[in-house]
Amino acid sequence: MMQWSAILIRTCFSGSGGEALTCATSEQQTRPELCFFFSVRSSWPSTISDGACLALVSAEQGATAGRNTLSLRSMMATEDMATSTRSLRSQATNVDDDANVSIENRGMNPSVLTKLGEFASTLTAGNTANKLWLMADVDPKSAFKLLGLDMPGVRFIDNPKMLQWLKFTKAYLDMKKSGFGETSAHALLYEKIGGPDLSLLLLSLKDAPDANSLVQKLTNSQFGMWHDARIEPEQLAQTVFKIQDVRKLPKNDPKLQVIDDYAKYHRKHRKFLNSIMII
């Protein structure tokens, strides 16, 4: 069974056996609302690829029969969103015929799933999750886990999920939501990636659309950490990147660009500090 790092309850619908599996996670004890992930597995019909997570919806406990009434909260985006949503609509409306299983009898309204699929088809795969996570008050730390960026061995450079997270975090910060700021974003990335690799990652994303301003702020936070540690630009190669002789690096090595950018940052802030001391 696929593992999800967050949001309370996972419900998987089989395309053949028609069984609905629910699994509570540890967050159930800390969050007041119930949420559901609708996800697919590799054993399902070939029209849905493994890992295509389609919907995150809230579930309010029914007042009478103890049944869950589903309402739209969010939807995950993957590269297979277009295929996935079409298949979701098809399965949601035909599940009784194909598997002889009544979702209604399980306390779930199949029309909700159909509406979820129709709603997803109006959004692009690149922004679906971010827009709906914002609607669902998902914070960047949770989004980091939902995207699998907290998993051991994950690659960050050239990872589209990393860019998606940065875009989401910028949108989250622009909405001035409390509890997570630029300092929190840098601390999260620094803890997971480390200073040297983080600086290279941010360099690779400095021109990223809808995220470049946040990338620059995170870069300044990293440079500020080195500056506060009194690391001189000429020391950065050996102290941080463990390079004994920078002259042996290719001219297009991104480490040289990081060192040069840090030198500019260092000079600027040294001039600022000197001006304060003169005053």
From Swiss-Prot:
Span list, region W1 motif: 129-147
Function of the molecule: Effector that suppresses the host mitogen-activated protein kinase (MAPK)-based plant defense activated by the Phytophthora elicitor to promote colonization of the Phytophthora pathogen. Neither directly inhibits MAPK kinase activity nor interacts with MAPK proteins but acts downstream by suppressing transcriptional activation of resistance marker genes such as FRK1, WRKY22 and WRKY29. Confers avirulence in the presence of resistance protein Rps1k in host.
Domains as described in the record: The RxLR-dEER motif acts to carry the protein into the host cell cytoplasm through binding to cell surface phosphatidylinositol-3-phosphate.
GO CC annotation terms, alphabetical: extracellular region; host cell
Signal peptide positions on this chain: 1-20
L motif: annotated segments: 178-208
Short motif (RxLR-dEER): ranges: 86-106
Domain of life: Eukaryota
Residues modified by glycosylation: 100
Residues covered by region (Y2 motif): 250-271
Protein name according to UniProt: RxLR effector protein Avh331
